[in-house]
Amino acid sequence: MKTNKLKQQKGTLLRVLQYVKPYRVLVIVSLLCACVSAAAQLLIPILTGKAIDQMLGAGQVNLSGVLVFAVWIAVVAALSAIAQQFLATSNNKIAYNISRDLRNAAFHKLQRLPLSYLDAHPSGDLVSRMIADVDTFSDGLLMGFTQLFTGVVLIVGTLTIMLIKNWMIALLVVVLTPLSMFVASFIARKTHHYFTEQARVRGQQTALINELIEGQKVVQSFGHEAASLSDFNCINDELGRVSLNATFFSSLTNPSTRLVNNIIYAAVALVGALSAVGGGISVGDLSVFLSYASQYAKPFNEISGVVTELQNALACAARVFSLLDEDDRVPDKENAVVLSPKGTVDLKDVCFRYVPDRPLIEGFNLHVKPGQRIAIVGPTGCGKTTMINLLMRFYDVNSGAILVDGTDIRDATRHSLRKSFGMVLQDTWLKAGTIRDNIAYGRPDASEEDVIAAAKAAHAHSFIRRLPDGYDTVITENGGNISQGQKQLLCIARVMLGGENGELPPMLILDEATSSIDTRTEIKIQSAFARLMNGRTSFIVAHRLSTIQEADVILVMKDGHIIEQGTHEELLKKQGFYANLYQSQFALS
C-alpha cells in the first residue's frame, strides 16, 4: 500500500516537472538568484567574524577595520535583498504560469469529456478541482521554489565552509543532521494522506454548496432547511476532522525539526567553546561557526515546512491529473463526413442503456422524411429525452445506427451534425452577458435588426423593451434576474436567429420548449414555431399533448419502445395509450 502511494507521489511529481519544463529559463534565473542570495548570506557571518577579530579587547579596537567590514556587510546584505526580490519575482512567474497552464488543460479537458462523465460527477467537485485545488497547488509550488532553492544552496554552502574552517566540528553537525531529516520525512508521509482526504472532502463540500444554492427555492418550499443544514454540518464536520489531522501533523514539522536543530546548535557551541579555550579557533571563527550552525539549521526548518506544503500541493495536483486522465469522448473519424442534410433521419434497430444491466431503448426503428414534424410523447423515463441525446450524439448508441440523409452520424463530424439542428430545451441555459449576447450566441456577428427580429418572432421583444437597459441588460449567472419563462423565450429567440450566415438549420429539436411559458404567449409561440418548422424536419418532445396536435406523426413511447404511432386524430380513434393519456390530461385541466 505504501509502495503504491510512493509510486503515485513520484508519478505526480514527474508530471508536475513536465509543466515546469517550458519555464526552464526562469528556473535557471531562480537558481542563479538563489545562489547569489545564499552566497551573500554565507559571506555575512565571515565578515562579521573578521569584524569581531578587529576587537581584541578594551582599548584594542581597530575602528577603521571594523568600519570597512561594516560597509562590506551592508553591501552584501543589500545584494542579498536584491537577489531575493528577483528570486521572488521569477518564482511567482513560474508558479502562476504553471497554474494557468494546468487550469487551461483542465478546462480544455472538460470540453472533450463525454457527457456521461459530466452527468456522473457533481459540477461543484469539478469546479473545486479547477479552482481550489489548482490554487492550493500553485501556493505549494511557489513556496517550494522560493524556499527550496535557497535552502539547498545554503545547506551545501554552509557545510562546505564549516568543513574548511574546522572539519571536526563540521563532522559533528553532519552526524546529527539526519535526525532532522528523519523527523521531517516521517511527518511528511503522514500529512500526504490527510491532505489527499482534505482535497477530496473539500470537493464534496463545494458540490453540496453549489447544489443547495441552485436549488434554494425548492429547499425552502419543502421546508428542507434543517435537513440541508444537517447534510452540510455532516460534511463540514468531516472536512474539519481531516483538516485538523492534516494541520496537526503538518504543525509538528517545524517544532520537531527546530528541537533537533537546537540540539545541533548547542553541541556546536559546546565543542567550539572548548576548542576556543584551548586555542584551536579564534573567538571570531567561533562566532562564524555559531552563525553557520544556526544558518545550517534554518533551511532544514524551512524545507521541512516546504515538504509539508508540497504534500498538500501534490495531493491537489493528483486530483487535477485524475481529471486529465479521464478518457476523452470518442473522437471524430479521420475521414468523417461534413453533413449538409436535407432532413431525412433513420433510426435502425437502436439499442441504448446508461447502465449496462438496465436497458432503456431496445430495437427502436423509425423513418423520418424531410420536413416531417415528429412528436414524441410518453410517461416520464420512457426514453424521450434520451432520443434527443442520441440524435445530437451526446451519447452513442450501444447497437444499431442513426442515419441522417443515409450517413451514419458516427461517420460524420460532430460539429456539422449539431450545426444541422436548432435546439430549444426545457432546461434553459444562458451565459453571463447581455440579452443581445445571448440571443446572438450562435451568430455573434448578427446585426441589431436581426436580433430584434428574432426576439419579436419569439415574443420576447416586449418584455426586453420594458427592462431598464433593454437589449443591453446584463443577465446574471444562468439568468437569475429574469423569470424562467423569459429565459425560455430568449432560448427560442436564439434558435430563431439562426446559426452561421443567418441560415436556419434544416432540423429542429424542441424538448418541452414552451413548458415555462404562460398559455397566451404559448399560443403565439406555437404560430412562430409553425413558421419555423415549415419545411424542416422537427422532433418535438412534449408532456402537454395540446402542443403537438398538428404533428405529422406522433410517436408514443413506453419502456424504450414505440407502442403507438400516427396522427393525433388516428391515435384518438384507436382508444389506446395515447387516447387515455390525452383524456386524463384534459380531465385534469
Predicted region positions:
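Transmembrane helices of ABC transporter permease
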Residues: P22, L26-A39, W72, V76-L79, ...
